[in-house]
Amino acid sequence: MASVKSPAPLQKRIGAVIRRLRETRGFTQEAFADHIHMHRAYYGALENGKKNLQLSTLERVCSGLQVPMSEILRAAETQ
């Protein structure tokens, strides 16, 4: 039987992709959280894979980064 990756590592990989994209756009965590109208501590927990990322939240992050959701998910799958 094929093994299935657990959600926790996927959350961490998605968070790492989001962090990388945010940094390449020159945002600090605080500035980006303000940009997308999100509390900085909550946003930081998303990047660290400590919060379960809802699709509506991912949409908000993607909009702020100006990337399609599929780009983040694809990058997280290949990490």
PLM-predicted stretches and their roles:
Residues 23, 34, 63:
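Alpha-helical residues within the helix-turn-helix
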Residues 2-23:
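A short, Lys/Arg-rich alpha-helix, primarily the initiator
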Residues 16, 26-27, 53-56:
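Residue-level signal for the short linker/turn that defines the boundary of a DNA-recognition helix
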Residues 2-3, 8-9, 63, 73-79:
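Short, charged recognition helix plus adjacent turn
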Residues 56-71:
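DNA major-groove recognition helix of helix-turn-helix/homeodomain DNA-binding modules
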Residues 26-48:
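Short alpha-helical DNA-recognition segment
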Residues 19, 30, 59:
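Residues within the helices of the helix-turn-helix
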